[in-house]
Amino acid sequence: MDDLESTCASLRAQISATETQLAGLKRALHEAEQAAAHAKAQSAAATTAGDNHDKPRRWPLLDEEYRRYGRQMIVPQLGLPGQLKLRSARVLIVGAGGLGCPAALYLAGAGVGTLGLIDGDMVDVSNLHRQVLHRSANVGKLKVDSAIEYLRELNPHPTYIPHRAHLTPQEAPEIFQNYDVILDCTDNPATRYLISDTAVLLGKPLVSASALRTEGQLMVLNNPPRPAGDKTGGPCYRCVFPKPPPANSILSCADGGILGPVVGTMGVLQALEAIKVITSTEDEVRPPSLHIFSAYSSPPFRSIKLRSRRANCAVCSAERQVTLDTLRSGLTDYVFFCGSVSPEAVLTAEERIAPREYRAMYPAPTEGAPEKTPTLIDVREKVQYDICNLAESINIPISTIQASAAGSGDETGSSLPAWLPPEIASTDSTDPIYVVCRMGNDSQLAVRRLKELGLDRGGARVVADIQGGFRAWREQVDPEWPEY
């Protein structure tokens, strides 16, 4: 027994040492790739200069640059000084998706000198309706490489630096320190807090935006950048949102949906704000505001004035708890701070059924009638239910189910909510109840809620979810089921 324990301890130590070595190799590779990208860009710039290298330049820009940028240079707010500032600016875009694509497109077109892009995802066909730098031919390609390929065709003058991985607290400081302005084009709270914290700690202005369905928000944060405790500095993301939203309230574009022109509008506005930050003087910095865009409202734009830095902010106050050391060491846990959004542990294996097993037990109505007919509840929102649905299902949206508090009844005094159909609410029925959703997440929450209402009759009635939702249904039962 002692020998086995010693062997296990030795293996753990070897694994730990190997993981440490691997992390070091990854950092070394990242640094080497950055150095190679810079060297390649400098070589290209030297080649472009060509014959002009040995003779004094009469004008500060190349002749081709005057022709390319002339229409924006004659705008009074920009002019030649602004164009020169753009050419020397280094901008980092975190996220090459719906926000990052239009932002990168317009910054590259405007002549920003160095443009870095961070993203570890690959292009999916579902991205193409809104992520305008990616083409159908690039499905399956890294988003960063796909985006830079397009940008180089648009404007070969800027230096494009790819960061082919998701942002981590350990690597963020080393990446951010090489840039002047940061754009947050991500879609999850944990990364937003990480980006803001790193930008504040390194003194970088941050342009942050978000978009979902038909609405978007935009803020310029940490502008002007000031040391911790300096109240004249711009607020950070933590100053505006000291506490993250509840984990179960967060919707991604995949879950909530997104209209392409909406996220495109916000990305273009990010590019505009970045240009203003780069070309403006400190005297021209405006008070911080939250800009809200609602595509179906009139007027569609409104702004809310933001407060200055919070006196007790965890990152930009004099008594900050977040530092570069806590980032690099992993002591600042962003996933823990924001909470987990995964409902994987909500139900046990006995409370779930695979799509193929469900269809084997209960054939479609046209194929035969089972002895015990189950109730199949589809908890997708009505707009999704109307896209495609199973004929034998009924639609009770998850928002309706979650809106009623446990144990609350309707106005008649019933112990069950009014949204339950009579055949489900009947105290005599033991017919099974199955719940299905799009991905297999909301259905678990719905099953738990139905059991809280006592619909499982103390275990005498099956109340279960179809594991993996309609995504798994397409894989296991019906390959023609629409995937959206």
Swiss-Prot record:
Pathway where it operates: tRNA modification; 5-methoxycarbonylmethyl-2-thiouridine-tRNA biosynthesis; Cofactor biosynthesis; molybdopterin biosynthesis
GO cellular component term, pick one: cytosol
Residue ranges annotated for the Rhodanese domain, each copy included: 370-482
Stated family: In the N-terminal section; belongs to the HesA/MoeB/ThiF family. UBA4 subfamily.
Keywords assigned: ATP-binding, Cytoplasm, Metal-binding, Molybdenum cofactor biosynthesis, Multifunctional enzyme, Nucleotide-binding, Nucleotidyltransferase, Transferase, tRNA processing, Ubl conjugation pathway, Zinc
EC number(s) given by UniProt: 2.7.7.80, 2.8.1.11
Function: Plays a central role in 2-thiolation of mcm(5)S(2)U at tRNA wobble positions of cytosolic tRNA(Lys), tRNA(Glu) and tRNA(Gln). Also essential during biosynthesis of the molybdenum cofactor. Acts by mediating the C-terminal thiocarboxylation of sulfur carriers urm1 and mocs2a. Its N-terminus first activates urm1 and mocs2a as acyl-adenylates (-COAMP), then the persulfide sulfur on the catalytic cysteine is transferred to urm1 and mocs2a to form thiocarboxylation (-COSH) of their C-terminus.
Pfam families: Rhodanese (PF00581), ThiF (PF00899)
Cofactor note: Binds 1 zinc ion per subunit.
InterPro entries, per the entry: MOCS3/Uba4 (IPR028885), Rhodanese-like_dom (IPR001763), Rhodanese-like_dom_sf (IPR036873), ThiF/MoeB/HesA (IPR045886), ThiF_NAD_FAD-bd (IPR000594), Ubiquitin-activating_enz (IPR035985)
Residue ranges, annotated region (Disordered): 39-58
Lineage of the organism: Eukaryota, Fungi, Dikarya, Ascomycota, Pezizomycotina
Residue positions binding ATP: G98, D119, S126, N127, L128, H129, R130, K143, D187, N188
Primary site of residence: cytoplasm
Superkingdom per UniProt: Eukaryota
GO molecular function, one term: thiosulfate-cyanide sulfurtransferase activity
Cellular location(s): Cytoplasm, Cytosol
Annotated Zn(2+) binding sites: C236, C239, C313, C316
Enzyme class: transferase
Name of the protein in its database record: Adenylyltransferase and sulfurtransferase uba4
Catalytic-site annotation from UniProt: C253 (glycyl thioester intermediate), C437 (cysteine persulfide intermediate)
Any GO BP: tRNA wobble position uridine thiolation
Catalytic activity: [molybdopterin-synthase sulfur-carrier protein]-C-terminal Gly-Gly + ATP + H(+) = [molybdopterin-synthase sulfur-carrier protein]-C-terminal Gly-Gly-AMP + diphosphate; [molybdopterin-synthase sulfur-carrier protein]-C-terminal Gly-Gly-AMP + S-sulfanyl-L-cysteinyl-[cysteine desulfurase] + AH2 = [molybdopterin-synthase sulfur-carrier protein]-C-terminal-Gly-aminoethanethioate + L-cysteinyl-[cysteine desulfurase] + A + AMP + 2 H(+)
Ranges annotated as biased composition (Low complexity): 39-49
Cofactor: Zn(2+)
